[in-house]
Amino acid sequence: MFQIPEFEPSEQEDSSSAERGLGPSPAGDGPSGSGKHHRQAPGLLWDASHQQEQPTSSSHHGGAGAVEIRSRHSSYPAGTEDDEGMGEEPSPFRGRSRSAPPNLWAAQRYGRELRRMSDEFVDSFKKGLPRPKSAGTATQMRQSSSWTRVFQSWWDRNLGRGSSAPSQ
């Protein structure tokens, strides 16, 4: 669950330029508050004065207009950053919006799963397991069809010799 921390006005003014990605605050390094390394969701263009006017926007709108605070480098769905215990260092790059289409999140999960399975497959050969012979099997199947043709042509020739009617 994300909560909106309450800031003191001086802390909020110091961190407003850092939240927008404009570099370090002009006042220098003050006490490390939770607002120094967090920012609003990138899709919401609210400034600090708007937050002061409506500090409890989630209770007025039933949660629909709630401001979500997350770290700058986070591009994962809710809960992954806190669970993994990642550092709270700000990144120079802006994180992906949480309003990205669900297909994107599904594609990323699918891609990670495929990558994991591929890595397991490659690692299995390092453990001494034999390589699969799927390419050889495909070659044998093609050869068996050509052997069938050879056998049929031989059969046709032999039947043609034994019978009075010429073959072909």
Swiss-Prot record:
Major subcellular site: mitochondrion
Residues modified as Phosphoserine: S25, S75, S91, S97, S99, S118, S134
GO function terms (MF aspect): cysteine-type endopeptidase activator activity; cysteine-type endopeptidase activator activity involved in apoptotic process; lipid binding; phospholipid binding; protein kinase binding; protein phosphatase binding
Residues modified as N-acetylmethionine: M1
Subunit structure: Forms heterodimers with the anti-apoptotic proteins, Bcl-X(L), Bcl-2 and Bcl-W. Also binds protein S100A10. The Ser-75/Ser-99 phosphorylated form binds 14-3-3 proteins. Interacts with AKT1 and PIM3. Interacts (via BH3 domain) with NOL3 (via CARD domain); preventing the association of BAD with BCL2. Interacts with HIF3A (via C-terminus domain); the interaction reduces the binding between BAD and BAX. Interacts with GIMAP3/IAN4 and GIMAP5/IAN5.
Chain intervals for the UniProt region annotation (Disordered): 1-105, 125-145
The protein's name in its UniProt record: Bcl2-associated agonist of cell death
Result, substituting R94K: Decreased methylation
Residue(s) carrying Omega-N-methylarginine: R161
